Amino acid sequence: MAECDWDTVTVLRKKGSAAQSKSKQAVTAAQRKGEAVETSKKWAAGQNKQHVVTKNTAKLDRETEELSHQRVPLEVGKVIQQGRQNKGLTQKDLATKINEKPQIIAEYECGKAIPNNQVMGKIERAIGLKLRGKDIGLPLEACSKK
């Protein structure tokens, strides 16, 4: 009779599945019980985000100082605008030529965009002007054969 202990409790209940724990009902029930609930919002879920900023935004949020990401200089925006107009392209035409959204071209021209080397390279080739380095605004030389 040593195995007959009236103080031990056996719980015959399975743990809920992942789908159940993600539901709104399960989250509110857990909050009512006082359990720890961690929620996180999916960023850009269901959208086609091709060029995501690779800078560490969480690290930037933790910093106490006033820090912000470097933006495209206005000088580069003016060069893009002039090069585009010299080729007779609208923002929409340039965007379709480089497979980007017109909004991205507008952001680069206004100086609001965070520089992305892929996008900058596409724009450089489309308008034929350098946008990076020290020779900003000079014509892009043809690639020399190796």
Curated annotation (Swiss-Prot):
The protein's location, in the record's own words, is: Nucleus
Q: Which InterPro entries match?
A: Cro/C1-type_HTH (IPR001387), Lambda_DNA-bd_dom_sf (IPR010982), MBF1_N (IPR013729)
Q: Which residues are in the HTH cro/C1-type domain?
A: 80-134
Q: Which SUPFAM superfamilies match?
A: lambda repressor-like DNA-binding domains
Task: Select a single GO molecular function from the record's annotations and give it.
Answer: DNA binding
Q: Where is the composition biased (Basic and acidic residues)?
A: 32-41
Source superkingdom: Eukaryota
Its keywords, alphabetically, are:
Activator, DNA-binding, Nucleus, Transcription, Transcription regulation
A GO CC annotation given for this chain: nucleus
Chain's role: Probable transcriptional coactivator.
Q: What is this protein called?
A: Endothelial differentiation-related factor 1 homolog
Q: What is the lineage of its organism?
A: Eukaryota, Metazoa, Chordata, Craniata, Vertebrata
Name of the encoding gene: edf1
